[in-house]
Amino acid sequence: MNTYFRFEWINGEENPCEYNLWRMFQIEPKPKSGANFMKPNLPNTENFSTASSSKIRQLSEQPSCSNSYKKLRHEMGSDNSNIDDPLDDYDDRKKKLAKKKAAFKAKKGYTTGQNKSDNSFEFEVEKSMDRKEPENGDEEESTEDDYRHAYSSVEKSLRKISLLPIQRPSHHTFCVFCSESYPPVEFHFCIFMTAAQKEVNQSVNEFLGKADTINKKMLESLKKFIHTSKVDTIAKHSRMENTSMKKNSDSPKKLKRPSTDPNPISKRFRHISDESTSSSSLAKNKSRSVTPDALPFAMIDSQEHRTQSGRVVKRPNLFCHKEVQIRKETVQKEGLKKKRVNKEKEVEQESTILLGISESERKRNRNMIRRLLANGFELPGDDYVLPPLPADKSTWTREQHKMDIYGPIYCALQSFKPAYTTDMTSEFLEDDGDTEFKSENSESDSDSEDEQKVENDVASSADDIEFIEIVEAERKMDQNLAQQVRSSFVTTAENTENNMLMEDDSSEQGSSKFNRNASRRSTENIEFITIDDDDDDDNDIEIIA
C-alpha cells in the first residue's frame, strides 16, 4: 500500500517556498469504486489558500485540553482553588516554551504577526537574510559567492527530490522549491521565484516527466545534468540581480524644494562658493568659459526644475546677491519715473490755469507745425491780418474758436495743400485738442526726401523737362482722386450708421439678418482704386473705400 502526503500552505506573504510555511499530513486512500480507486485525497487547488486558512482558524478556535478539564471539574462541583491542579503546571510550562520560541525566532530574524482578515498566524521574514552586496574591487569574491549560492541551491533541490514518493503519475508537475508533486493547474503558489529558479524547475520537470518512478541512478544523472547546465546560469542571474540592485540604489533621488531660511542669501552664497572651489564644479562649467568671478551667477542661472509632467522650467533664484541689487535698481528707476510724471502733470495744470492751453497740446502743435514745414508749408508773416471775429463768444463756431487760439497759422492752413495725398489740414481740423496728433508713418518723410533727390537729378538734365511736367500733372490728378474717394467714404459710413440705428430700433430678433445685410452693404460700397506709376514702385497708391 502506498503512502501519500498532503501539503497545506499557510498564507505567507514574503516567500511561499519557505519550509516553515507548509504543513505535511499523511493521507490514507479511501476505497472508491471504478477508476477513482487508489487516488490520493488531495485538497482542492483552486481554493487552496482559503481552505487552509479556514482549517487553521478552526484548529485555533478549539478549546485546549486544560480548559475542558477545568470545565468538567466546575460542572462536577469540585471547583476549589486550594486544590492543586495537575494541569496548572502544564499550562505554565507551555507558556515558558512559547516565550523561548518567540525569543529564538526574534534572534533568527522572524517576527510573528496576525492577519486581521483571516485571523491566521503568519511569519514575516526580515531582509537581514539577504546577501550583502560586494564592495568595489571585490569582484572575485562576489563571483565565488554566486557560485557557492548556486551550488547550495542545487543541492537543496536534489535533497527535496529524494523525499518524493517513488511512484507518482507522470503528468504531475514538481516544484523544486516547494518539495511537492501536484496536478497541473493554472494557479501555482510559487509566485516569488526568480528567473534562475524557474529555469531549474522547468528542467527538472522536463527530466522527471519522462519517467513514472525515481531511482538512485536517475537522481545521480539528474545531479550531473543540473550541475553542468544550471549552476553557471544561476550564478549569472544572481550577479545580474546584484548589479540591478546597485543601479537602483545609486540612482539620483528627486530634487526637494528649498527650505525656507531666515537668511537665504548668505546660505546660498556659501553653498555656491564651496562648490566653486571643488574641481568637479569647475570641470562642469569649462564648456561655458565662465570666469571664477562670474561663476556663482552662471551656476544659479543653470538651475532647472522639472514639473510632474516632465516639462523643464528654469527656476530663477531670487535670493542671489547680484539679482537683489538689480531689483533695487529697477525699483529706484520706477520711483524716478513716477516723480517725473507727477511733475509733468503739475506743469500742465499750471499752464492750463495761466494760458488756457495744456502743455501736451502745445507740444502737439509744435510737432504738427514741424511736419507741415517739412511738407512745404510757409508760416504767415507779421503783416498777415486775421478776419474779424464777433464780439459775443457764445455765438462762435468751432473754427472761430480755433482761429482765436491758433491765430494766423490756422487761417493759412485752410488754404494750404501739401505735395502728397496725406491731407494734413483735415487731420488738424478733426483733432479735438485732447487726443495726440499721430502721423500716418515715418516712411512718408523718407519717401519725400528720396523723391526730391530724384527730381533734382532729373532737373539737372535739360532733356528731361517734359518728363517733369508729366509727373506734376499726374500728381495733381492723384490729389483730386484721393479727395473724391475720401468724401465718398465719409458719406457711405454715415449711411451705414443710420441704417444700423434704424434696424436696431425696429427689431431685436432680426440680429442675424442685420449682420448679413450690413456685410453685404459694406462689400458693395468698397471700391478699389489703384494708381500705378511705371517709374517708381514705392509711390503706387492703393485706396480701399
UniProtKB/Swiss-Prot annotation:
Residues 325-354 form a coiled coil. It comes from the Eukaryota. Residues 108-150, 236-290, 430-461, 493-545 are annotated as: Disordered. GO terms for biological process: regulatory ncRNA-mediated gene silencing. Disruption phenotype: Mortal germline (Mrt) phenotype in which there is a progressive decline in fertility with each generation at 25 degrees Celsius. Residues 111-120, 508-517 have a biased composition (Polar residues). Residues 124-135 have a biased composition (Basic and acidic residues). Keywords: Coiled coil, RNA-mediated gene silencing. Residues 530-545 have a biased composition (Acidic residues). May play a role in transgenerational epigenetic inheritance. This is Protein hrde-4. It comes from Caenorhabditis elegans.
